[in-house]
Amino acid sequence: MEPPDTLRRVRVLVVTNFEPDASTPQRGRWVRDQVEEMRRQGAEVEVFSFPPGKRHYAPATRRLRSLLRQQHFDLVHAHYGLAGWCARLAGARPLIVSFHGTDVRHSVVGPMSRRLAWRVDLVAAVSRALFAAEDGRPGLPAVPGSAVLPCGPDLGRFRSIPRAEARRQLSLDPQRPYLLFPADPARPEKRHDRAAELASACGVELLRGGSIEPDEMPLWVNAANAVLVTSDYEGFGLACLEALACDVPALSTPVGIAPFALAGLPGALCAPFDLDAWSAAARPLLEDPDPRVEGASRAAPLSAARMAERTLEAYRDVLGVID
């Protein structure tokens, strides 16, 4: 008889300040996808979420402290550095904190995250790159036992859909070429200006993320001739993998997972942003009525289900050490 899975006998609390709102419904969907995957794999996981913004941190810490006094959780997993500080100050232990990118590279939040890294039971980053400096921005400290725990794409949602069908559902012109910038244009590190410059140079319409409902995002990806990741930096770069999961070409700066995921893939580009080079890569895709790449096989090893398995293994390790 197989031994019972220890995670069926523990309760995990996930803490996140990635709570979505009407203007950014996609925010934090990657955390929610991972939670759902962990539940499907047998773990009992509850979620404590609150909106981003400095006015929310003190009230959230008080509410979290009260929750931890009223209910027992065997492990707390916070996503994003400031949410991690809330959990730490609320007395959460054992505590895992996953750092996602901006919380490491930001000039104000980054130093706070590096201090927090020495005060938790497991430091997790969504990519190895976050442990190294990048363009003068420090990374996370090399805390012994640190882990890499990304949140991967939900392959149940992000899959290849006929481009004509995606455009029909979105009421987009079936004949026109489109580029998709899937991020929120208001986030400066995502560099919407680069995507807009490229679309203008190629004479095509740029579709923009930010206010797209999460369940509709796979339609927008499949409707586009190519997905643009023009960021200055990414923790993991989930948009690149979501495009690949749909077999849609991705053009990306060398950030996050892109150098690994796009290496040697025909129809894709991973290079520093240069208008001439990117235009040359984009034009053949814009001239093709249905450009596709062999991307799904590259996204599969990093799927939400696979990354949930990896995260549950990290929980087992932490609970084994603490116990």
Task: Indicate residue ranges for each PLM-predicted region.
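Conserved donor-binding/catalytic core segment of Leloir-type glycosyltransferases
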Residues: 13, 173-190, 196-200
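A charged, aromatic-enriched C-terminal amphipathic alpha-helix characteristic of glycosyltransferases
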Residues: 26-29, 273, 287-319
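Short His-centered aromatic/hydrophobic patch
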Residues: 78-83
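Short alpha-helical donor nucleotide-sugar binding micro-motif in glycosyltransferases
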Residues: 117, 219-224
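A short, active-site helix/loop in glycosyltransferases that binds the activated sugar's phosphate group
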Residues: 118-146, 153-160, 311
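Aromatic "clamp/platform" in nucleotide-sugar-dependent glycosyltransferases that forms part
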Residues: 232
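Short hydrophobic beta-strand element within catalytic cores of glycosyltransferases
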Residues: 249-252, 259
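Conserved acidic donor-binding segment of nucleotide-sugar-dependent glycosyltransferases
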Residues: 264-276, 283-289
